[in-house]
Amino acid sequence: MSSSFGIHQRVRPALRQYAVVSLLFVATGTAAQEPLSLPEALKLAESRSTLLVGSDFAAQAARERGIAAAQLPDPVLKFGLDNVPINGPDQYSLTADFMTMRRVGVMQEISSTEKRDLRRRRGEVEAEREIAVREATRAGLRTDVALAWIDRYYAQKTADLWRVFAADVELQITALQAGIANGRSNAPELRAAEVVAAQTADQISAAEQQARMSTTAIARWLGPAAARPPGPAPDAATLAFDPDDPAVLARLPQITVLRQESALAQTDLRLAEHGRTPDWSVEVAYQQRGPAYSNMVSIGVAIPLPMFPQERQDRGIAASQAQVAQAEAQLQDMQVQRGAELATNVEEWRSLQRRAKALQRTLLPYASDRAVQALASYSGGNGTLAGVLEARRGSVDARMQVLLLERDAARAWAKLNFALVDGAQRTRSAP
């Protein structure tokens, strides 16, 4: 009897702490803070992300480079002295000899319109690639935030479930103590209830630890708002797009990034092919001679001569062709990889949804009925309080099993639902 009383003295205060104080904290402390819904968490994370801002600047930089590359080079202003005598009677004179001229000219390098259009197009494609990178970063951010939010939500639900059971166990311990006093209960029953109380307190502690860890994880993206309690769970039975639509794969951000990489490589190839046609330079010069002689104007054209195209231009084209082949191979590999991942994630999501619904239809009613029957038997004098606790613990375990399945289904849903950031008009529910 003294041993049982000692155990109870150690367990019961902790049990009260979790079953009463924690419930009061949830009721009062969280009431002062507005719940944080998943959509709000996603929006807040995006607004705080410096990576997304950096991607916007990268796209802007690519556009600016493309516009600059499409312009003609700056003209070159040229000055010079031609044919200055260095000996004889007219040594160093700038006006005595008829061949001596002071020259000023302008030279302009001219690229073909097609080449300049390609340079501008390259900047546009590079900007589109940066936008695709931004969308891929955004999709990853939304997925990570959603997973952390879901982990925190279900950790809180788990703690709440164990707190309710802890309060029930507390009542049973009180009843057992009264029963021992009037001879209806015995010490072994009380010890068994106190063991359940200790186990329940540990479960609450573990769930609260998981909730704190999830809060710390999500604070990386949300800052102080991570301390707000989670709002209602999202509808994890419906996706924002039809996973059976073959076009979904092409809209995945990772696929779009590699598709833009391929387009960029193809643009570089076209530029390399236009490199066979050299850029011309046109020069106009004005030459001033001595007062006794006429001034002159010169016009000239400079054309590079590709003497060894097989060693320069052709090798540049071959390098660009290899880059195109590499980009296409990476795109095809990513399509296969992401297609397999998408199919696997869809099957996992549907399977978890089916299992959770099946247990809700079968296991939960059975466990609840068993707990009711155990209590009725005890009230009628045909059962024991230990049997009541066992049945109620079984009911809690059943609800925990369903809760874990719902959490896993919600995580699978998040990986699918936020794989696309643009969504789709159609929705598809899990069968």
Task: Map each language-model feature to its residues.
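Bacterial Sec-pathway N-terminal export signals of envelope proteins
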Residues: 32-88, 95, 99-100, 109-111, ...
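Acidic, low-complexity, intrinsically disordered peripheral segments
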Residues: 1-12, 87, 401-431
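N-terminal signal peptide c-region/cleavage motif recognized by signal peptidases
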Residues: 26-29
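Small/polar (Gly/Ser/Thr/Ala-rich) solvent-exposed segments
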Residues: 53, 76-97, 109-138, 153-156, ...
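Periplasmic alpha-helical coiled-coil/stalk elements that build and connect Gram-negative outer-membrane
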Residues: 2-5, 36, 137-251, 345-348, ...
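Amphipathic alpha-helical coiled-coil segments
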Residues: 54-69, 130, 137, 141-164, ...
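Short, charged, amphipathic alpha-helical segments
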Residues: 120-124, 187-196, 385-393
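Membrane-embedded beta-strands of outer-membrane beta-barrel proteins
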Residues: 104, 299-301
